[in-house]
């Protein structure tokens, strides 16, 4: 939920209010076309709000703070504003927010010390299965803990200018390092818990930002996190981004999918 922590308006990815988090790619590069076929664009009506990942033909995983009653998704998009014949639109039939996510923070524009944005993940059941193609492919959940120091790739259409809210046209990628959670704990007064990951570049300049919430953090080729929250302006030195740690939630995800075939 890229709730930007200064101004973390849950604008991050579309949540009109989430405190300390914001998401967009800063200091990155244009992703190679169709190189992230699992990346999903999550909308509220016709408004882009967040990223997400395709888990299988029926399910998308995104951040809980991206929740709206009228979520829908586009799969296989590269350019956010162009019609692309290979892209697929799907309505969402049902949303499953993690039961421990604190919804009272969902639209709170004021962030407070010790606010806890843990459990920031949500499953979206598609109304019609996605067609799996060369440009629309699912990604597997992690089976092992990520290793500190791993090279991670984050992607999204979030703002590419730290102090200005302006979505990217083309899907952006950025390389980050997986850092100790202590680095994020020192950077923020909000809680950094064991269900979160800390990733960034110590000198700043590279980060996710507003609009990137819910998008993937892929470390050493494995999906390990979802963009959740961080500092505004994005990319500041000693202000890494915070991500939902997916290895902690694989059982909940698998159980939810199995119980809702």
From Swiss-Prot:
Organism per entry: Mus musculus
InterPro entries: Peptidase_S1_PA (IPR009003), Peptidase_S1_PA_chymotrypsin (IPR043504), Peptidase_S1A (IPR001314), Trypsin_dom (IPR001254), TRYPSIN_HIS (IPR018114), TRYPSIN_SER (IPR033116)
Keyword Disulfide bond: yes
EC id: 3.4.21.35
SMART domains noted in UniProt: Tryp_SPc
Underlying gene: Klk1b1
Known role: Glandular kallikreins cleave Met-Lys and Arg-Ser bonds in kininogen to release Lys-bradykinin.
Protein name (Swiss-Prot/TrEMBL): Kallikrein 1-related peptidase b1
Keyword Phosphoprotein attributed: no
């Amino acid at each position: 939920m890229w709730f930007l922590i200064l101004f973390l308006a849950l604008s991050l990815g579309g949540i009109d209010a989430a405190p300390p988090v914001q998401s967009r790619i800063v200091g990155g590069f244009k992703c190679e076309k169709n190189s992230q076929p699992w990346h999903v664009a999550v909308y509220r009506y016709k408004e882009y709000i967040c990223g997400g990942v395709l888990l299988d033909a029926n399910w998308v995983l995104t951040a809980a703070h991206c929740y709206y009653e009228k979520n829908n998704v586009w799969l296989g998009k590269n350019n956010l504003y162009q019609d692309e014949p290979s892209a697929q639109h799907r309505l969402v039939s049902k949303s499953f927010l993690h039961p421990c996510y604190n919804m009272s923070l969902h639209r709170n524009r004021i962030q407070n010390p010790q606010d806890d944005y843990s459990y920031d993940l949500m499953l979206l059941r598609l109304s019609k299965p996605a067609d799996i193609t060369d440009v629309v492919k699912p990604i597997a959940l992690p089976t092992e803990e990520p290793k500190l120091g791993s090279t991670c790739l984050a992607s999204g259409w979030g703002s590419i200018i730290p102090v200005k809210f302006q979505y990217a046209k083309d899907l952006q990628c950025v390389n980050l390092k997986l850092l100790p959670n202590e680095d994020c704990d020192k950077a923020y007064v909000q809680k950094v818990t064991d269900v979160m990951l800390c990733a960034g570049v110590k000198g700043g300049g590279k980060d996710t930002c507003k609009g990137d919430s819910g998008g993937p953090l892929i470390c050493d080729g494995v999906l390990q996190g979802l963009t959740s929250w961080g500092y505004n302006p994005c990319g500041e030195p000693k202000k890494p981004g915070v991500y939902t740690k997916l290895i902690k939630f694989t059982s909940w995800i698998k159980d939810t999918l199995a119980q809702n075939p």
